[in-house]
Structures are given as C-alpha cells and as structure tokens.
C-alpha cells in the first residue's frame, strides 16, 4: 500500500493550479514549527521522524491511486501524469528525533520544488503532530515518576495504528515498555503484560486464578489484587506465590493510602521484595502525587496516547522561501495574519548551554538565502572550555537528494532517539519540569 493518499485534497489541487500557472516547479523551502506550546507545557519533545522517513519511501502514486484520482476528477490529466512519476528528490533537515523544542524551533526544513514539497504537508504534520504530542506528554510523566519505570498501556484507548505509534513515541520519551505487541515487533519496544480482571473472574476463585497464573508464568509474575477485596487479594497472592512473588498491581481505589497499606501488608507477610505497580487512569499529575508513596512502577493508558489533554502538538508547515525565476535570488516569504505570523527565511537551530551544562536559550539562525542556496543543514557545535558556555547544533540531515539517512530509521533509530531524548531533557533547567502554567523552558532568540 502506498502512503500517497494519506493527504488532504487541497495539496493536489494546489499542485494542479501551480503547474498550470508555471509556478509548480519553483524551488521552495517549507518549515515545520510550533507557534506555541499547549497550555501548561514548558517544552515539547519532537517525535515521528523515523516513521516519516518510512512513509516517505512509500509515498508514490500507483495505478490504483491514479485511477481513483482520475475517476473523482481531483486533478487534471497533466497533473496525473506528473503524479505518476512522483518521487521526492529534495532534501530534508531538522531536529533529530527525541530532541526538545520550544516555540519557533525549526523542527523540519523541506527543500524541493513547490509541487514535490507541498504534497508532503499532510503526511508530515499528521505524523509529527501526533507522535510529538505523545512524546511530550510522556516526557512529563517520566519526570514526574522520579526514576520509577513506566509502561505504556493505552492501545485500547486509541486507533489500532495510533496505538503502535504511541507506544513508539512514549518509549522514545523514556517509557520502559508497552503492552502493544506490534510496537515490539516493528520498533523493538520491550513488551509487558500479564492478566486483566476477566482472568480472575473466569475462575471459580481468586486463588484458582492466581495459582493458574503462577504455574504458567512463574512466581515473578504480577498478580492483579483488586478484583474483589485488596487486603484479601494480597494475602491470597502471597499464599499462592510465596514470598518471592514478583509484583502486585492496583487498578482502582485511593492510591496514595492504598499503596501504603499494601506495602505494609506485603512486608508483614515476608514479601519484602514484592513490587507494587499502579495503573488506574494515571496522568503526570497523579504520578507526581504518588512521589512519596511506595510505588515501584506505573502503567499509563489513556492520558499518554491522547497527549494528556493535548492530542496534537500544534505544529504547522509553512512556506518560508522560494527562488526567483531562472535561478535568481532566494526570497524569504512569511504569513502576516493576526495570531498566525510566520518568519521568512531558511533556519537552523542551536542551543546555548551554560558552563554547568544547562540549556539557557534556543537560537534560531535565519540563514542568508540571497546567494541562491538555502542553508538549513547542520553546523558544528561550538564547544567551550570546561565551565564556559557552548553552542549545541540542533539541525541534522534527514534526507539528502531524495535519499533518507538510515540512521534514524527502524528499531535502531528508536534507540538513538530514546538515548538522545534523555540527554536533551537532562539539559533543561529544573523549572522545565514543573507541571503548572509558565513560560517555555527556553527563550527563543532569532539571529
């Protein structure tokens, strides 16, 4: 299956009209950025580049696609002929997956003809907006968990395709595992899961259910103890599995007090090494509220796969420069609508790091395009002496002349993004992790 029709109709009608006007093959630069962060957020985590590069490889119009477009009279015959030969031959630079961003960060720069670049708008935004929303929410949950493991468990709270993308994005942001098996197969995300309440209800007694689970999965399994009565569930779990029981799970109740009671009961029964994991519609706020409680791990569902109240990151894809006819000068272009202003010119990002290794500002460099070559590529980082400020370059090549950089793709790309996200988040000032309203973690400085 191609990915070419995962787009909006107006992308193709723009191409149709632009080819007719003679502007369709004009060299252009498009940029992806966020005008603002969702309410209560201090930073975002960009994710989805690896998935986008995969989708880009399949972005072509096959016979079935073209036949449907012709039948629906979406575009002219001339444009259908152009689409039949479509392969993205341009270049894409941008922030690497897992990088932190703030308003104005030039997350992606797409360079090509107007026609070949504009047709990617919907695919780019639908991928990055969702994945970045999940990764941004997940990063806040990781910070709130105070180093305790988190598992993504939201597959039943979103579409089947989004569930896989969400598991991937959450893992990049620091979640340790997912319940989604396809995310494990396709992206190498560690998977986990044992039993639901239905398994307990299937058996004649809670003890029978626990015994069947332990005999099948071993004493290291996690037993769900709140189907009936939690105190009795703990007692039964330890009696069946012994003091070596791996973990118990709580999915309901007043968690701050309940986990303390369960911890005390487990310890009194000699199961001092048995862990407690909690689920129950957790958010970053409820996780933070359990910081002092004896919780060993968390399972998060609805809130992480829906971006914890911000299901889209608010990213936009705007034309920022085009070349004058016949190889002339490059001209910055910008939108000036109230509330939706954009800045013209090709850009690249740099982060100012102070002498303690903390990020203090986001520098957005507007490159001079008058020489006819927009320069949105990576630059070397300016590393200062120990204890002195330094500059970290944020823009890297993702696609060059139509060829994707394989480093950022597949399970290996996911692990690179995960490692980088941990580093990038650790650079942020402490106030970036506050969950209340406030300014972005870093000021955006245009240069």
Residue ranges and their predicted role:
Residues 29-31, 89, 150, 316, ...:
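A residue-level signal for beta-strand positions that form part of recognition/binding surfaces
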Residues 92:
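Segments forming glycine/polar-rich beta-alpha architectures that bind adenosine-containing cofactors
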Residues 1-84, 183-185, 433, 437-438, ...:
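Non-catalytic terminal segments and appended small domains
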Residues 277:
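Contiguous mid-protein beta-loop-alpha structural module that forms a pocket-lining wall or clamp
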Residues 1-26, 36-38, 80-89, 98-272, ...:
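Buried, small/hydrophobic-residue-enriched core segments of structured protein domains
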């Amino acid at each position: 299956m191609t990915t070419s029709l995962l787009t909006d109709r107006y992308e193709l009608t723009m191409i149709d009209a632009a080819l007719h006007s003679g502007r369709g093959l004009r060299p252009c630069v498009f940029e992806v950025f966020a005008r603002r962060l969702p309410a209560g957020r201090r930073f975002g985590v960009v994710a989805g580049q690896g998935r986008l590069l995969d989708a880009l490889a399949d972005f072509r119009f096959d016979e079935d696609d073209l036949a449907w477009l012709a039948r629906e009279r979406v575009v002219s015959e001339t444009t259908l002929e152009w689409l039949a030969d479509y392969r993205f031959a341009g270049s894409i630079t941008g922030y690497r997956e897992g990088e932190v961003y703030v308003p104005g960060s030039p997350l992606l720069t797409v360079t090509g003809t107007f026609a070949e670049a504009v047709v990617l708008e919907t695919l780019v935004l639908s991928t990055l907006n969702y994945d970045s929303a999940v990764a941004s929410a997940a990063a806040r949950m990781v910070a709130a968990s105070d180093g305790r493991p988190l598992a993504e468990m939201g597959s039943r709270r979103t579409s089947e395709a989004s569930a896989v993308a969400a598991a991937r994005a959450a893992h990049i942001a620091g979640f340790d595992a997912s319940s989604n098996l396809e995310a494990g197969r396709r992206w190498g995300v560690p998977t986990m899961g044992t039993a639901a309440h239905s398994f307990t209800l299937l058996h004649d007694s809670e003890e029978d259910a626990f015994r069947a689970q332990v005999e099948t999965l071993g004493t290291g399994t996690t037993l769900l103890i709140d189907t009936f009565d939690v105190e009795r569930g703990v007692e039964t779990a330890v009696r069946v599995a012994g003091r070596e029981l791996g973990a118990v799970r709580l999915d309901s109740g007043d968690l701050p007090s309940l986990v303390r009671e369960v911890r005390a009961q487990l310890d009194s029964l000699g199961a001092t090494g048995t862990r407690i994991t909690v689920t129950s519609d957790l958010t970053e706020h409820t996780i933070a509220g359990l910081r002092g409680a004896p919780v060993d791990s968390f399972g998060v569902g609805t809130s992480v796969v829906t971006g914890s109240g911000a299901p889209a990151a608010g990213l936009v894809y705007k034309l920022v420069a085009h070349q004058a006819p016949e190889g002339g000068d490059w001209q910055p272009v910008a939108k000036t609508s109230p509330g939706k202003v954009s800045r013209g010119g090709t850009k690249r990002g740099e982060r100012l790091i102070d002498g303690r290794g903390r990020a203090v500002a986001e520098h957005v460099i507007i490159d001079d395009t008058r020489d006819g070559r927009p320069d949105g590529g990576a630059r070397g980082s300016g590393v200062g002496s120990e204890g002195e400020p330094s500059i970290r370059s944020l823009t890297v090549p993702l696609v060059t002349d139509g060829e994707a950089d394989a480093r950022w793709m597949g399970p290996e790309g996911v692990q690179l993004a995960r490692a980088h996200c941990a580093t990038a988040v650790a650079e942020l000032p402490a106030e970036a992790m506050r969950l209340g309203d406030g300014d972005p973690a870093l000021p955006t400085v245009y240069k």
